Amino acid sequence: MCIRDSRLAGGIDPFSAGNALREIVPAIKALWRGDYTGEGEHWSFPKTTSSPKPQQTPNPPIWIAARDQNSHDFAVKEGCNVQVTPLWLGDEEVSSLMEKFDIACKNYSDIERPKIMVLRHTFVAETEEEILQGAKDISRFYCYFGAWFKNERPIEQGLIEKLTDEEMAGLEMYSPENMRKNSVIGSPEEVIARIKFCEDLGYDEYSYWIDSSMDFETKKKSLELFIEKVMPAFN
């Protein structure tokens, strides 16, 4: 997020953040090999190395979050695994992200195909009432996610100014109905089918996005149902 980049780098726009990533990934690999001097636009440091050295050959796996085609291309070119998320969007976006990854693999066919992981908001419940409440909670999460990302509302003591019910109701793309449709929310059987869809597209790993506006016990129950009734459907 731009807020995080600004905080960590003392003010940096998303485009510059992408360039900084493209510079630091090769540098990290070189540091693992040892005696590397950083002389880049964003990173500069004298000859140094990592200690101890990693045991993996040629280096530990690196995961890069990607959305646009350039990010997929860069990750595959560098031999890095890719993590994608449709955010509040649905299966169409999940398919589109895999298409970008496949294009990147074709563009760099000389590189061994890396792994790809999809991160999706996931909620498992046993009753329709619980499922609908889960959709409402994830809707609320994204309303605040969008507000933080826009970086326009006042912040006091680390908390953003509360959104009104009217403001959240006006954010149709984050509506509970859309979250119920787009996010992986439902009974164990429904969730299995949604994850099978991702598996059939070619995703290697599925990441359960548990962060939401739900309370701890609700999250715990969902995760327990996922472990007990969803995971056995997969190897």
Residue ranges of each PLM-predicted region?
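A conserved active-site cap/scaffold subdomain adjacent to cofactor or substrate pockets
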Residues: D68-L89
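Conserved small/polar residues in nucleotide/adenosyl-binding loops
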Residues: M1-I3
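Hydrophobic faces of well-ordered beta-strands that scaffold small-molecule active sites
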Residues: I62-A65, C80-T85, P114-H121, Y206-Y208
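An alpha-helical appendage that flanks or caps ligand/catalytic pockets
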Residues: F15-S50, E92-Y203
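Glycine-rich tight-turn/loop motif centered on a GG-T
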Residues: L8-F15, K220
